[in-house]
Amino acid sequence: MYGLEMLEKIKLEYDKWACLTPKNSLYDRTLVWLFLSLLMIGFIMVTSASIPVSTRLNNDPFHFAIRDSIYLACSLLAFAFVVKIPMRNWEKYNVPLFLLSLLFLASVLIFGRSVNGSIRWIQLGPINFQPAELSKLAIICYFSSFYVRKYDEMRNRSASVIRPMVILFLFSSLLLLQPDLGSVVVLFVLTFTMLFIMGAKVMQFLLLIVTASVSFILLVLTSEYRLKRVTSFLDPFADAYGDGFQLSNAQMAFGQGQLWGQGLGNSVQKLEYLPEAHTDFVMAVVAEEFGFIGIIFMVVLLLCLSFRAIKISRDALKLEARFRGFFAFGVAIWVFLQGSVNLGVASGALPTKGLTFPLVSYGGSSLVIMSVAIAILLRIDYENRLTRVGHAQIKEP
C-alpha cells in the first residue's frame, strides 16, 4: 500500500509539472534537461572508458561503472535536497561554509591520501572526498555575500579588493601545497570575473591580472613538476613514452575519432594506453568514439548550461536580488571555465591540470558538488520567478 501511495504522489507531482507550459512553469525545464543529459552522457562514457582499467585492477569490468552509479544516485539525492533550501540560508551561512571548506583544505595536508603523487583526497570510510571541489562552491557563496555587503564600497574604494585577494591567497596557498594548480586557476578566474561584474575599477582589474600572470609564471618556473607539464604540453611527442605519454595518447584519440568517431565502446586508446581515460581525459574517449560531431555536441551542451546560468544571473540582478545574481554568475563561470580547461587539456591545447569535465568525468566529489551547484541555480531561478509573480500581483489594479 505504501508503495502505491508513493507512486500516486509521484504521478500527481508529474502531472502538475507536465501541465505547466515553459512560460508559467516554476522551474527552468531547460536547465533540468541539460543537467540530466550531462549526467546520462557521463555515466555512459565512464562505463565505456573504465572497462579495461577496471578489469585489470578489480577483475570486474563494471567496478567503476557501479561506483559511478552510486555517485550518480548521491548527486540526484543532493540535488533534490538542495533545491529546497532558500537562498537566504546560503547567504546567512556563507561564513560557516567558507570556514568548513578552509578546514577541509588544511586537513587534507595532514590526513590526506596520496594519489599519483598529489595529496588531494581525504578518506571518509569507503569514499575519497576532494575538498578542492567544495572550496569552489564556498568561494562563490562567500564572495557573493561579501560583494552584496560591500557593493558601493567596491565601486568607490581601491582598498575594498584587499580582503578578496587575501582570502584567495589563503585558499591558493593550501591548494598549491597539495599540489593542485588547476583548482587555483579556477579560483583566480572566478574571483577576477566576479570582481569585474561587481564594477571594480579597470586599473584595479588590470593590476590584479598582471599580478596573477606573474605569479603563475613564477609558480611554473620554480617547480620542476609544473615545468615538465608545460614543456611536455608544448611538444608531447618529443617524449611520447615519458612526460608526454598522456597528452600524446589523448591527441591520438582525437585524431582517430575523425568526423563521426569509431562508435561507442570502440576506443583503442582507453585500452590502457591513455591514463585516466575515465576521469580527466574522458573527453578524449568521447572524441575517439563519437568524433568531431560528438565533441561539438558536448561543447554545445556546456555552452547552453553556462548561458542558462548567465540568464538566471541577469534575471536576478534585474530584480535587485544581488546575492542570487552574483551566485548564479559565479556558477556560470565555474562550469564554463572548468569544462573549457578540461577539453583544452584533453585536446592538447592546454597543459594538464587535473580538472574534471562538469557532470561527465568520473569522480564522486566533483559530481556531487557540481550537482549541488546546479540545484542552487534552479533554486535561484525558482525564486526569481516567484519574485516576478509577486511584482506582477502588486502592479495589478
Swiss-Prot record:
GO CC term, one of those recorded: plasma membrane
Catalytic reactions on record: [GlcNAc-(1->4)-Mur2Ac(oyl-L-Ala-gamma-D-Glu-L-Lys-D-Ala-D-Ala)](n)-di-trans,octa-cis-undecaprenyl diphosphate + beta-D-GlcNAc-(1->4)-Mur2Ac(oyl-L-Ala-gamma-D-Glu-L-Lys-D-Ala-D-Ala)-di-trans,octa-cis-undecaprenyl diphosphate = [GlcNAc-(1->4)-Mur2Ac(oyl-L-Ala-gamma-D-Glu-L-Lys-D-Ala-D-Ala)](n+1)-di-trans,octa-cis-undecaprenyl diphosphate + di-trans,octa-cis-undecaprenyl diphosphate + H(+)
GO molecular function per UniProt: lipid-linked peptidoglycan transporter activity; peptidoglycan glycosyltransferase activity
Biological pathway: Cell wall biogenesis; peptidoglycan biosynthesis
Subcellular location as annotated: Cell inner membrane
Xref: Pfam families: FTSW_RODA_SPOVE
InterPro entries assigned: Cell_cycle_FtsW-rel_CS, FtsW, FtsW/RodA
Keywords: Cell cycle, Cell division, Cell inner membrane, Cell membrane, Cell shape, Cell wall biogenesis/degradation, Glycosyltransferase, Membrane, Peptidoglycan synthesis, Transferase, Transmembrane, Transmembrane helix
Similarity remark: Belongs to the SEDS family. FtsW subfamily.
GO biological process, one term: FtsZ-dependent cytokinesis
Species the sequence originates in: Haemophilus ducreyi (strain 35000HP / ATCC 700724)
Name of the protein described by the UniProt record: Probable peptidoglycan glycosyltransferase FtsW
Bilayer topology annotation: Multi-pass membrane protein
Cytoplasmic side stretches: 1-30, 83-94, 147-158, 201, 302-325, 378-397
Intervals, Periplasmic compartment: 52-61, 116-126, 223-280, 347-356
Positions of transmembrane segments: 31-51, 62-82, 95-115, 127-146, 159-179, 180-200, 202-222, 281-301, 326-346, 357-377
Function: Peptidoglycan polymerase that is essential for cell division.
Enzyme Commission number(s) from the entry: 2.4.99.28
